[in-house]
Regions:
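Elongated scaffold/linker segments in the mid-to-C-terminal portions of large proteins
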Residues: 59, 63-215, 280-324
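TPR/TPR-like alpha-solenoid helical repeat scaffolds
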Residues: 76-88, 245-256, 261
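A glycine-rich, coil/turn loop motif that links secondary-structure elements
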Residues: 23-35, 78, 246-250
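Surface-exposed loop/interface segments of Gram-negative outer-membrane beta-barrel transport/assembly proteins
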Residues: 108, 242, 248-251, 271
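Secretory-pathway/luminal and periplasmic proteins that interact with or process carbohydrate-rich
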Residues: 47-48, 66-74, 238-244, 264-269, ...
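C-terminal helix-and-tail extensions that cap enzymatic domains
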Residues: 253, 257-264, 292-297, 322
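Active-site-adjacent helix/loop patches that line small-molecule binding or acyl-intermediate pockets
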Residues: 261-264, 274-277, 281-284
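Extended, hydrophobic/aromatic-rich amphipathic alpha-helical segments that build helical scaffolds
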Residues: 4-20, 27-65, 95, 144, ...
Length: 324
């Protein structure tokens, strides 16, 4: 494991040194800032086995927050995911995949989440292959703007208003996870949107630094207070009141608040929240909190290895525990 991590780290350090700074990099291409964001994610991943990595997270996060990188939070969370909300003018984006109606990069998120009978905002039905849960929606504070695009109702193609209380509703499991804004051309473009897919944002740096400060070995009261203040910056943009430092006076309490903010801030973006829960040994706990599933077990944190890999390994490759 140490050799593998060192190999990845060396590659990213080289990239961070030789790639252009964000203000010099072409939008949609790799930059020094993106390489350092990936370093942060690598270091966070390794804190599960060595908390000393939090010191590296703290160092790199502070570097990304220096003026020379030019990152800043956007004032409007919702507009960031609407048509025209991306591009080089958006200084919160660390890396995004440019998408357009005619490619080569395509965004089919609307089709993934819209019910088959959806008919509003100039858009028609999708495939409805992804949904959210009402437990997730209800976990937000009422005035949190980040749940704006969790649609709790919609107009159907037959003119019926569908909501969570409609009998046999397509919203029975949860709201529509329309993280991207309305794009009227989706229906006529084969399901493609012109809204770019944002993978990493500056808000992640704030919350990563908050975690490093509060979870590192020997975190002081001042470290905890600073961590809470960083979380509050992200909450303020969402229209929420500040969390109280006096109520979050232990690393464990700060971590719980931090994970909730990650849950609410980055839903349906890059899928890393599952990994965050795993490295803190909280995945099963969170899954059971949502639906109390009897099938949620710790061994499922790892996927089974393909049978072909085990056969080709000729005894050297062992199946992950729980799948034998």
């Amino acid at each position: 494991r140490e050799e593998q991590v060192k190999f990845i780290e060396d590659d990213l350090l080289f990239a961070a040194e030789h790639l252009p700074m964000p203000n010099k990099a072409e939008y949609g291409r790799f930059s020094s800032g993106f390489a350092k964001m990936l370093l942060i994610r690598l270091y966070l991943h390794e804190t599960a086995v060595n908390k000393d990595y939090y010191n590296k997270v703290e160092t790199v996060a502070n570097e990304l927050m220096s003026p020379q990188y030019g990152y800043q939070l956007q004032r409007d969370y919702v507009k960031m995911f609407e048509l025209g909300g991306q591009g080089s003018a958006n200084k919160e984006i660390i890396y995004a995949l440019p998408c357009s109606y005619d490619g080569p990069g395509v965004n089919q998120w609307h089709m993934m989440v819209l019910p088959t009978d959806f008919a509003q905002g100039g858009m028609s039905g999708g495939w409805a292959t992804v949904t959210s849960t009402w437990a997730f929606y209800d976990s937000f504070e009422a005035k949190d703007v980040r749940r704006t695009k969790l649609l709790t109702s919609y107009m159907s193609s037959t003119g019926e208003q569908i909501n969570r209380n409609t009998p046999q509703s397509k919203l029975a499991m949860g709201p529509i996870a329309l993280k991207m804004g309305y794009d009227p051309r989706v229906s006529a473009s084969g399901g493609h949107s012109d809204i770019d897919l944002i993978l990493y944002r500056y808000a992640d740096v704030y919350l990563s630094l908050a975690e490093a400060l509060s979870q590192k070995t020997g975190a002081s009261g001042a470290d905890l207070a600073k961590a809470v203040s960083l979380i509050n910056v992200v909450r303020q943009r969402a229209g929420l009141d500040n969390l109280s430092v006096s109520n979050l006076n232990t690393p464990e309490k700060v971590l719980d608040a931090l994970l909730t903010e990650r849950w609410h801030e980055f839903w349906c973006e890059n899928g890393q929240f599952r990994s965050d829960l795993i490295r803190h040994h909280k995945l099963v706990q969170w899954v059971k909190k949502i639906n109390n599933s009897p099938y949620a077990e710790e061994y499922k944190e790892l996927y089974p290895l393909p049978l072909s890999a085990i056969i080709d390994g000729k005894g050297a490759v062992k199946q992950n525990a729980g799948y034998q």
